[in-house]
Design a protein with these regions (language model features):
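Short, hydrophobic/aromatic alpha-helical segments in well-folded domains
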Residues: 6, 19, 69-73, 130
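Catalytic core of non-heme Fe(II) oxygenases with the double-stranded beta-helix
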Residues: 43-113, 153-162
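Non-heme Fe(II)-dependent double-stranded beta-helix
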Residues: 1-59
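A structural signal for short, well-ordered beta-strand segments
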Residues: 33-36, 70-72, 143-147
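A structural signal for short, well-ordered beta-strand segments and their strand-loop junctions
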Residues: 30-33, 85-86, 122-123
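Short, well-ordered beta-to-alpha junction loops that form the rim of enzyme active sites
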Residues: 34-36, 89, 125-127
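Conserved double-stranded beta-helix
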Residues: 93-98, 102-122, 126-127, 132-210
């Protein structure tokens, strides 16, 4: 995001936010991470894992969950090209991969995440999942976007990582300000958020990357 505005709209994509509200149980959450994953031919296989630690809240009534992750398929996800496998219902157990005898082995309840390019799949950070081996001749690519409860630390502290020019760009529009709020950058004590803040020239090489 410090390079340009290409990803500015990702944290405020309405359907992703609605999914986060539904799973987390309210609006007290923020953007946790954004990353890409490319699985070249012959690679991409992972052991089953969750994206968060044990969750005793899953056993409460009603259950409590810490967040969501999502996959935007930049390539088709097929049976042959290493599509993600997910263990249906695992998020309700409160356990992680530590409960498995062999996280690398097939699981009887696993299902494949399949779809054409452009498909978005949203899932709990507590569900077991993993990439599988890409047996096709082309790289399989996707974007992961995650939202977590606000009391959980971010993968990258967005407020500290944002370059001055990124703050200035986001401050120009209502959507940009909304993006900053979801990213956890709405601290009124941050001098960069003042309307009269002057951006000092800063070489791109010194700007931290989000």
């Amino acid at each position: 995001m410090n390079d340009d505005g290409f990803f500015d709209a990702v944290p405020v994509q309405p359907k992703l936010l609605a999914a986060a509200v539904h799973v987390i149980g309210g609006s007290d959450f923020r953007w946790f991470s954004l990353n890409t994953r490319g699985s070249p031919p012959g690679l991409g296989e992972q052991a089953l894992h969750t994206d968060h630690g044990p969750n005793p809240g899953a056993l409460e009534t009603p259950p409590r969950y810490s967040g969501i992750n999502s996959v935007l398929m930049l390539s088709p996800f097929t049976e042959q090209n290493g599509s993600t496998r997910m263990v249906s219902g695992w998020h309700r157990t409160g356990d992680t991969q530590e409960a498995l005898a062999d996280p690398s082995a097939p699981h009887p309840d696993e299902q494949r995440m399949l779809g054409p390019a452009g498909t978005v799949v949203v899932f709990s950070v507590h569900i077991l999942h993993s990439g599988t081996r890409n047996d096709s001749e082309q790289t399989r690519s996707c974007i992961h976007t995650s939202f977590m409860r606000r009391d959980r630390p971010q993968q990258v502290n967005q407020r500290e990582a944002a370059a001055p020019q990124t703050i200035a760009r986001l401050m120009r529009t209502a959507k940009g300000r909304a993006t900053m709020a979801v990213m956890g950058m709405q601290d009124e004590d941050d001098p960069r958020l003042r309307d009269d803040y002057t951006i000092n020239d800063q070489p791109d090489s010194e700007a931290p990357r989000l």
